[in-house]
Amino acid sequence: MASTLPPQTWEAGYARPADQASWEAETNYVAESGERAHWMLPVHTEPPTSTIGNGLGLTHLRTWPSIYDGTATGKPEWFKPSKEVDVLICGAGPFGLELGLILARQGISFRIVDKANAPCLSGRADGVHPRALEQLHAWGLAHEVSEEGPILNSTVLFRNGVKLFHGFSSTCDSRYKGIHIITQGQMERIYIRDLLRHQIVVERGTTVQHFNVQSTSQDHPVRATLKNVATGEEEVVRARYLIGADGAASSIREQLGVEFDGITTDIYWAIMDCRFKTDYPHILGFNIIISAEHGGSIVIPREDGYTRFYTQINGEKARKLQANRQARRNASTVGETRIDDHGITPDEVLEQLNKIIAPHKVEFASPMSWFSVWRVSERVARHFSSPDLRVHLGGDAAVLGAFGLNSSIYDAANLGWKLGLVLRKHAEPSILTTYDKERRLFANRVIRCSGAYLRFICNSSLPLAALRDLGEHLESHDENLPLLDGSTEADREFLYTFFKRHAMFLLGVEWPIVNSAICPADTKVRASSLRNGVRAPNPRVCLATDYTAYLYDKMMGVGRFHLLLFGSDLQGPVRQRLAVLAGELRKREGFYERFGGREMFNLILVVKTLSHQTAELLEGDLAPLKDHATTVYDDRAPDDDAHYWYGVNHARGALVVVRPDLAVGVSVWPEEIGKLNKYFASFLLECEETLPTKKSLLARLWDAL
C-alpha cells in the first residue's frame, strides 16, 4: 500500500468505510468484567513515506516496529542468536531476506544483519515477473505477493507523438501470466513476517565490519566481526558460509576485491509515486512516452489509484544533478546511484514530465507517496563466489542496472537449494560453482537487454557496458542497439526485433543455459522435448476427483528434486518401462534410497487415466509407484495436457528430473536407471545409512567368490 488505509468495517460482509477501526478501540481489549485482554496492541507509528513532498505534502504509512524493525525495537525473549551458524547473511534487502526464507525452510541455521534500523517503507522496486512468482509459490508466498497490486495488461508506446504500439502487454503460459505490481517495501514486510514464523529476527543497526576465511578444513572457517552501529559494540561470529547481500556498494564484495565491471552513466531518472490528475487517456496501463527533445517517461499503474512516473532528467537539470554528485565524496567504487540530496524538486520533475507528455497535462492530485532520483548504473560483479566457495554475492551486490527485485529472487532460488544440500550433507560442495556460472551469464544478459531498451527510451547513443564472460575475456554478443535516426520505421523495427528476442526473458521464463553436472548437455534423442536447464512448464492437472490445479501445486518446497514420471494410461508398451523404474524404488542400493529417498525426491506420477481407474492399474509390477509417488491425473484434451507440454511419447513414457529451483535437470526414459544413477552420483552424496559397512562389503566379496 502507498499510504495508511482509512478505517474500514466488514460488518456487512465486505469492506466499507468506518468512523473508527475496531483494532483502535479501547473497548476491543476489555472483557465485560473489566479484565484486560492478555494480548496487547503493539506500538505503531506513521512515518512519512518520502523524504521530499510536493505542494500537497507527504503521505504517511502505518507501520509496526515490533513486527518489522527487528532488533531495532529490542530482542524478543525467545531470540538467542548463536555465535556459530551455518550461514551469515550481510544485508536484509530482498536478496538477503529471500535467501533466509529458503534456508529456514531447510532447517539451516543462520543470522541476518543489516545496517539500517528498519526495512524499506515505500517505493523502490515496482513489479515481479511471472517466473519470480512461480518461485515464491514454491515457498508458499505467491498468493500474498500477487494480490497486492494490479497486473500490467496493456502497453502503450509513443515516440515524438507517434503511437508505435498499443496492445496487450506480453504474457506467458505461467499461471501468473504477466508483470504484477508490488513495491519493495510491501515485499520486505511479507518476508519479515515469514521469518518471524521461523523464529528469525533481522539484527538491525549491525554491519559486518570485517571478515576472513581461515582454513577451509575447519568446521566454521568464516570468522566475521559484527559491529553495532549505535553502540560500537563488536561480536565475533563464526559461520560455514558468508553471503554478501548488502547492495550496490557492497562492503563484502569490496573486501573480497571483486571487480564490479560495467559503467555508471550520466542518465538520471526521477521517480514519483502519487495520485495524479491527467487528461492522458492511457494512464491505467503501462506506458512509455518518448520525446527526442525532452527525454522519456515510463508510466506504471499502482494500487489504490496511485501511479508511478519515471521521468528522465536531461539538459540543464541533469547537469545540475551531475555537479551535485561530483561535489560529494564517495568511497564506493560504484559511485552514487540513488541521489538523496536531489537538487531537483517534484514540481520541477512535473514540469519536465509535462514537456514529455505534451499536449496532455499531468497534475498532482494527492500528497507525495515517494520521490527519488536515480542515476543509471550498469554493472555485474566479475565473480559471484569466492575461489574457496565460502563467500557468495547476490542481488544488487552482484548485478546492478535492472531486474533488481526479480534478479534477487532468482539468485536466492538458485543459491538457496545448493547451499542447503551441501549443509545438509546431501551434495558435494563443488555444486556451489554452478551458482556463479548460471547467474552471471543471466546478469550479463539483463544488462545488455535492459541497456539496449534504455538507450531507445532515453535517445542515447551510449555504448553498452563491456562485461566478462565466464572466463576473463570480454563477452561477445549480438545485441542490437536502436538506430535513433528519427524514423518511425526504424523505431518499429527495433521494437519488433527486441521483443521477438527478449519478451519471454523479460517475464523471467527464459534464460541462458550453462552445462554442468546439474545440467548436462542435451542429447540428440531425448525422452522429453524439453532442453536441459529450461523452465519446467506448469500445465493444469487434476489432483483429485473434485480438485483441479497446476502441476507446480505438487512441487512445493525448496530442497527436493521433483521426479516427474509420465506414464500415459499405464498400459501397453509403456507399462514394462515403468515397471523397471518401480522395481528400482524397492532396492536399497538404487538411486532413490541411496541418495535420500523421500527427503531428497518428490516422485510425481502423471497419468492419462481417471482416478477411479488408477488404483487397479497400479497393482502388481507397478505397486511401488503407489507407495512412493503422488499421482496426478492428466485428463485435459491431448492438445492441452501435461504429456503434450512436456513432449512425451505415450508408448515410451518419460522421467523428467526437475531441480528444486524448478528448472529441468535432465530427462530420461523410465527404464534408463543407469543414467539416473550417473546423473545424481555426479553431485549428490550417498546417505550414510545406505552406505555398506565393512562387514557387509566383505560379505558381498565372499558371496562373489
From Swiss-Prot:
The protein's required cofactors: FAD
Pathway(s) where this gene product acts: Secondary metabolite biosynthesis
Top-level taxon of origin: Eukaryota
SUPFAM superfamilies: FAD-linked reductases, C-terminal domain, FAD/NAD(P)-binding domain, Thioredoxin-like
Biotechnology: Azasperpyranones display potential anti-cancer activities. Azasperpyranones A, C, D, and F exhibit potent growth-inhibitory activity against the A549, HepG2, HCT-116, and HL-60 cell lines, with IC(50) values of 2.39-14.42 mm, respectively. Moreover, azasperpyranone D significantly inhibits HCT-116 xenograft tumor growth in BALB/c-nu mice. In addition, azasperpyranones A and C can bind with four kinds of therapeutic targets for cancer, eEF2K, FGFR, survivin, and TNF-a.
EC id: 1.-.-.-
InterPro entries from the UniProt entry: FAD-bd (IPR002938), FAD/NAD-bd_sf (IPR036188), Phe_hydrox_C_dim_dom (IPR012941), PHOX_C_sf (IPR038220), RIFMO-like (IPR050641), Thioredoxin-like_sf (IPR036249)
Similarity comment: family membership: Belongs to the PheA/TfdB FAD monooxygenase family.
Function: FAD-dependent monooxygenase; part of the cluster A that mediates the biosynthesis of azasperpyranones, members of the azaphilone family that exhibit anti-cancer activities. Azasperpyranones are synthesized by 2 clusters, A and B. Cluster A is responsible for the production of the polyhydric phenol moiety while the azaphilonoid scaffold is produced by the cluster B. The non-reducing polyketide synthase ATEG_03629 produces 5-methyl orsellinic acid, which is then reduced to 5-methyl orsellinic aldehyde by the NRPS-like protein ATEG_03630.
Protein name: FAD-dependent monooxygenase ATEG_03635
Naturally occurring in which organism (per UniProt): Aspergillus terreus (strain NIH 2624 / FGSC A1156)
